[in-house]
């Protein structure tokens, strides 16, 4: 190992580095970790830092401080990625640039069901389903789903609704669904529509239009004029959309445009996505720390993080020097990609749009930051705090007559909601409907861990409730030794009207703020988010608890019998109201099965 005060001998060190996946750590003076990185080939990746020329002054400055490089070979790239993430979180290296984005990129899902469902999707992929994306934003997904519904009329309903319908829904009436739920289209015809939709999502729009045009002519020759007209309408819809969204009509291209823009001390990297020639929109992102970060460093960090998790398109257009990007892409990507700077007119238009949107994002960020600071300062003055509360945690309780009680904790940092730190708690072991006991339990679970050294201590706690809830919360904080944390309750106003809330302090004081007070607006925003997060969790828990009352979970009831039952009685409520004798009259339902149905629904 090299002595701390000796110059680092990179050449000698590199001879010892294996060509294996792993994690490397650049160590500087006082054993301070300068940088943590992951590589699929440690030797090649670490060697790239010690070339004669560096990609940027920031990297050159880091390399000049290196006294040692520690490496940890791993069994796979996936293991290296996990280790790298853990080390970055625990060591907080100075030269790591992180793009923190609480929301994952959205996808379009085609489920693996007999009649596949078209759906918006975030999160982990389900086995058997097909996914198309990523899309830069929710709007792009929603618009694409709307287009696919209008053109190919695929179902979007969830399986419980699909399996229990006895008549077509409104979407069928407005020609947005072919109603496979009630057998108005057979499996083969529906599968053909699914194939066309999949090809369109894969960027093969021209093939889809050619296919539909051929179908139209074939139908016309058979004198099937209604079918021909339907194909004609599909072609017109697709052509109209493509005419509006194509930014280069010469070919169906898959391109990512990455623009790095610096305004003052703020750097923004914007990624715009073109799939099959359609411009899907863009997504500006900001590094977690911007001091001293140039456009090249920000772009390289974004490219490395983004394409570790997302598929590389056929073409990547950047506005920074190609050489360092090419070295990075060779390291992190297995498939070839054409790397370009804008030269053609269409490419310059794409990049200009991306750069302009990055500048607009910087302006919006500055405006939002100023607004958040103003609201936090108003809250500090209102609550008479020494400093503006950077981290605020808010709690709410949700249940239905004591059933399936769920507590929520949402987090706001510097005036912005931190979705990745939200938590839900299933409340058990209390008297149903006892909100005070529920609040006590969630706070004990949350702040018992904080008192033990796990988690982060907030600057302010908001409690959705009045004096009783605040009293319970105050007691818990005293029990765990955290009574010094500022806390306030938010009691609902008359008829729960916004703007009439009352602030309830632990000492019993109560205060009302003006309806236009910026501190009240911040409190309302955080409180409403806690309520939303609690009630969605409660509904999911309640639905799960009641799932046994649905027909599909009754032994002996398959899809055909379920459909016959719903058709005979007009829906689940009608089945529930039927007697055993009524149920026996349905074809295929024996008395034993009828009794099982009756017992399950009562």
Swiss-Prot record:
Gene Ontology cellular component terms for the protein in this record: cytoplasm; excinuclease repair complex
Protein origin, superkingdom: Bacteria
Residues covered by the GIY-YIG domain: 19-97
One example GO MF annotation: excinuclease ABC activity
CDD domains: GIY-YIG_UvrC_Cho
Domain UVR: start-end pairs: 206-241
Subcellular location per the Swiss-Prot or TrEMBL entry: Cytoplasm
One of the GO biological process terms: nucleotide-excision repair
Signal peptide annotation: none
Keyword field contains Hydrolase: no
Keyword 4Fe-4S attributed: no
Keywords of the record: Cytoplasm, DNA damage, DNA excision, DNA repair, Excision nuclease, SOS response
Xref: PANTHER family: UVRABC SYSTEM PROTEIN C, UVRC/OXIDOREDUCTASE
Function comment: The UvrABC repair system catalyzes the recognition and processing of DNA lesions. UvrC both incises the 5' and 3' sides of the lesion. The N-terminal half is responsible for the 3' incision and the C-terminal half is responsible for the 5' incision.
UniProt family annotation: Belongs to the UvrC family.
HAMAP family: UvrC
Name recorded for this polypeptide: UvrABC system protein C
Protein species of origin: Aromatoleum aromaticum (strain DSM 19018 / LMG 30748 / EbN1)
Organism placement in taxonomy: Bacteria, Pseudomonadati, Pseudomonadota, Betaproteobacteria, Rhodocyclales
